[in-house]
Amino acid sequence: SMKLWNNRNYISFDFTVYEKNIHIMSQPMGTLRSISTDDNAKALMNAKKYYTSNILIFDAGFGTLDLYDIVNRKANSKETFAQFGMRAILEETGKRIQERSGVAIRSAAMQNALERGAFTITERKGVKISTKTEGFADLLEAATKEICEQAVEKVINMYNALDEYDYLILTGGTSAVWEPYIREYFQAIERLTVVMGNENCPDLDIIFCNVRGYYMYLIEWLRRKSIQK
C-alpha cells in the first residue's frame, strides 16, 4: 500500500506476478551487462571481448565482497566474504582511534565523524569539562589500505594470482575507494586489464552499475519479446 499525492489514506494494490515473467540475475552479472551495453540497451563494440574473455568481477560493497568469475564463457562460481568491505574498514578505523586516543566511537556515530573528518575527545576533571577535536584521516587511510590488501591477498590465493584472467572488473562503492590500490597491485600483470564497472557511463555512481545492468537486460528482454509476437 502507498499514499498518492495529497491523499491521507493508503491505497492498496494487488499484483499477480507469474513465474514466466521472473528472471533472476546474480548481482555482479548486472555489472557485466552494464559495461557491455549502451544507454539504449544495445550491445557495445567491446561486448564480445568481455563475453569471450576470462573475467573476474570484484564487487566490494558496504557489508561484503562478492567475487564472480567467468572462464571459457562459463560462470564458475560466486564467492562472498563478510570480512571485506566498508563495514570492515570502519570497524578497523574505530579500533585504531580507540588505541590512539582512547575514544570509542559507536558504529552509528561513525558517519557523523566521517562527515566532519574528526571526532571529539571529552575530558572531565571534577565539574570542569574540556573538549578537543582530533582528525583521523591517517587512521582511515591506513585501515582502508589494510582491508584492501587483505581482500587482494584472498583473490590472489583463490584465483592463482589471476594468471588465467583477462579482465578484473571493479564494481561497488568500496571498489571505487580501493581502485588506486588495486591498479597498483596488479599493474605488472601483462595479460590483465583492470576495468571500472561504470567505464561506459562515467557520470553514473559505481554503486548503481549492477542495477543499470538489470535494467538494460530488462529492456533487451522486452525488445526481444515484442519482436517475437
Segments from the language model and where they lie:
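Glycine-rich phosphate-binding loop plus the immediately following alpha-helix
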Residues: 68-110, 206
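A mobile "lid/hinge" subdomain adjacent to the ATP/sugar-phosphate binding pocket shared
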Residues: 99-141
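Short, functional N-terminal and low-complexity linear motifs
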Residues: 57-63, 115-123, 148-149
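Nucleotide/phosphate-binding catalytic cleft detector across ATP-hydrolyzing
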Residues: 1-55, 74-77, 82, 86, ...
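Gly/Ser/Thr-rich beta-alpha loop segments that engage phosphate groups in nucleotides
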Residues: 63, 174-175
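Basic (Lys/Arg-enriched) interaction patch that binds polyanionic ligands
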Residues: 54-76
